[in-house]
């Protein structure tokens, strides 16, 4: 029996003696992952190892929360991180130094949570400005004010999730009604489109595509629920122009009017033109109108957005 006890003790000492306490995994295992976020680094000197560990922590935060990168809140979170352990593994051949950068999750939460609460309160306050019954243009103006806060709230939540051991979101039920509010209010603004003249289908394609990219609802010009009206008249000049340098040249233009259908007011007018030369007359007409369509679509997007923001 004594021999058996002696053998067990001997095996225990051998096991303990074989445990390398200088490994990164062993040193990191001393920290409760529920309470701390720990990142390792190494270098030829203590300072190099410390700097590398802290830099690695900073890079991980920035990589997982790109929208918060470069902001004050990220700097404030990092201000709570410390390099708590620096050591040298004498048994390793490279004799490098190792370091651990440690971020207490509770301290990080103390920075992020108040900002989340404040942003939620601001969003709630703005949401109370929505009209009853709904007024598409007035509601969209409120949504424009909310959108920067929505983006800020989402960035803060990314940071909050990264700090949590379980990667949970902060009060998702509170933020859920606002996440897509801008898209919803934008889609509620119905735009009627009417194009008359040569190559009208070509023009319509560019205009509708631009409005869809903005997220606006597109309807027929005769729809009684339209909020904004886009009216375009296209023309083709020099349709019978002579060949120049072996090409048949054509010049196209469009007169565009943007109207507030609710107020029956034209808030923007402009003209665009373009020219193209090909070996075939029909191709010249089409390509010149495509150029007009691209220009018109770009200006419609810019002018309409400015009006919707300031109306």
Q: Model-predicted segments: where are they?
A:
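Sec-dependent bacterial lipoprotein signal peptides
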Residues: 1-14
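Domain-level marker for long, solvent-exposed, non-transmembrane regions
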Residues: 16-311
